[in-house]
Amino acid sequence: MAALLALAGAACWGVGDFCGGLASRRTAVLVVLAISQGVGLAGVLVWALVSNDGFPGVVPLLPAVAGGTAGVLGLAALYRGFAVGAIGIVAPISAAWPIAPLAVDATRGIVPNMLQWLGIGLVLVGVVALSLEGAAAGGSRLSAGAGLALLAALGFGGFIIGLDAGADESANWAVVAARAASVTLAVLVALLTSTSLRPQSRRVLPLIVACGLFDTGANVLVAVASNRIPVGVVAVLGALYPVLTVVLARIVLGERLSRGKRVGGAVALAGAALVASG
C-alpha cells in the first residue's frame, strides 16, 4: 500500500511539474513558484484542519521547513531548466535525487533487499537512458538545462529527507510547514528583486494552479508513504515522475520520443515494480 502511495505521488509530481514547466515558458519562474506554492499551501492547510490532524508543535516541523526551502530551490532550477531545455530531457536528469535519501537510509542501517537493489539499479539505468539525447551527428549529449536539472536533483533530495524527518508526527502538517517555507522564500526573493508576482497573462493561471495542487498532493502522498517504508525506497519510486512528464511532453508539445527514451521508460517502470514488490 505504501509503495502505491509513493507511485501515486510520482504520478502527481509528473503532472504538476509538466504544468509548472509549461507555465514557466509563458511567465517568470518566480511567478510560477510563488503562486503555485501558495495554492498548494492553502490546499494542504485546509486538508490538515478538516482532517482534525493535531498540530505537533514547531520544533518537530523544523526539518520539514528546511526541506521545503531546499525543495523550492530545486523547483526553481527545474522550471528554469524546462524553460531553456527540452522537458523530456531535463525531467529525467532531475530524477537522480534518490541518491541522497538512499545514503541517509544506509547511515541508519536500512538496506534494501536484493530484489529492491535490482529494481533500484533498473530505475537508475532507465533514468540515464531517458537523460541521453541522440545528437544529429551521432553519439549522445546532455541537453540544454542539464546543469539546472542536477541542481534540481540536489534540492529534491534535501526536500524528501527533511519532509521524512518532519512527518514523524503528522504528514499533513509537515507538508504545511514545507509549503510555508517555500512560499515565504519565493515572496522574499520577489520583494528583494522588485519582481512583480502578477502573471504576464491570465491564461497561464490554470497551469500554475494545477501545478500547485498536483505538487502538494504528491508531497502529502509521499510523506505518508515515508512513514511506512524507508525513505530511500519512497524516493526511488517517486523518481519515476519524469516518465509521465515525458509522455505529456510528447502528447501536448510533440517532443520526439526516441527509441532510447522509450526503452529507458520501460526499464525504469520495470525497476519500480521490483522495488514495490520487494
Segments and roles (model prediction):
Residues 38-44, 93-106, 181-185, 218-222, ...:
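Alpha-helical transmembrane segments of compact multi-pass small-molecule transporters, enriched
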Residues 15-27, 76-85, 93, 106-107, ...:
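Juxtamembrane C-cap of transmembrane helices in multi-pass membrane transport proteins
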Residues 78, 97-118, 128, 189-193, ...:
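C-terminal transmembrane-helix exit sites in multi-pass transporters
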Residues 32-33, 174-175, 234:
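Juxtamembrane helix-start motifs in multi-pass secondary transporters
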Residues 1-11, 19-20, 24-30, 35-66, ...:
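Membrane-interface interhelical linkers
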Residues 8, 35, 66, 93, ...:
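Hydrophobic core positions of alpha-helical segments in small-molecule transporters
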